[in-house]
């Protein structure tokens, strides 16, 4: 499995995976075609805010991830939010998510890493905890 930066040629495959991810129980909102495209295009631009990654093998794309950059005043250092982490159903359980978490932990070893998970997504939470993430007791709020 190879992890690489998302490219323009990946947009169609990534947007298709986003449709599946956002239609699943892993997220609260369903997103929209407009949002999926904006997110994917932001990943392949020179954006200082969002990075996109693709996981692939000789058969093709296995999944994707998107990471947003910010600063954590709580911890006094840069913060990487793992916004999306999606592995196609047929490739789950092969360590791809764990490999990505190890990759991003190494790349941003001087940063706080954060992510969100639905409480019901026990399989993902197990992977995150195994990678060293801890559950925070916060209630998250949003204003759109």
Tell what function each PLM region has.
Residues 2-16:
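A short beta-loop-alpha structural element at the N-terminal edge
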Residues 5, 105, 109, 129-138:
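Conserved acetyl-CoA-binding loop of GNAT-fold acetyltransferases
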Residues 19-42:
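Conserved GNAT-fold acetyl-CoA-binding loop/helix
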Residues 42-54:
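A short helix-loop-beta-strand connector motif used in the catalytic cores of GNAT acetyltransferases and
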Residues 54, 60-69:
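Conserved beta-strand in the GNAT
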Residues 83-92:
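A short, internal acetyl-CoA/4′-phosphopantetheine-binding micro-motif in the GNAT/acyltransferase core
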Residues 91-103:
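Conserved acetyl-CoA pyrophosphate-binding loop and the N-cap/start of the following alpha-helix
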Residues 98-99, 114, 119-137:
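Conserved active-site alpha-helix within GNAT-family acetyltransferase domains
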């Amino acid at each position: 499995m190879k992890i690489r930066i998302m490219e323009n040629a990946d947009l169609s495959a990534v947007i298709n995976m986003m449709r599946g991810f956002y239609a699943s129980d892993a997220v609260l909102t369903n997103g929209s075609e407009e949002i999926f495209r904006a997110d994917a295009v932001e990943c392949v631009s020179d954006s200082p805010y969002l990075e996109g990654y693709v996981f692939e093998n000789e058969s093709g794309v296995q999944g994707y991830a998107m990471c947003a950059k910010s600063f954590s005043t709580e911890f006094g250092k840069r913060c990487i939010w793992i916004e999306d982490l999606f592995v196609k159903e047929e490739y789950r359980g092969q360590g791809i998510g764990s490999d990505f978490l190890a990759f991003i932990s190494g790349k941003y070893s001087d940063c706080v890493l954060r992510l969100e998970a639905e409480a019901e997504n026990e399989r993902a939470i197990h992977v995150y905890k195994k990678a060293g993430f801890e559950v925070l007791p916060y209630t998250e709020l949003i204003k759109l």
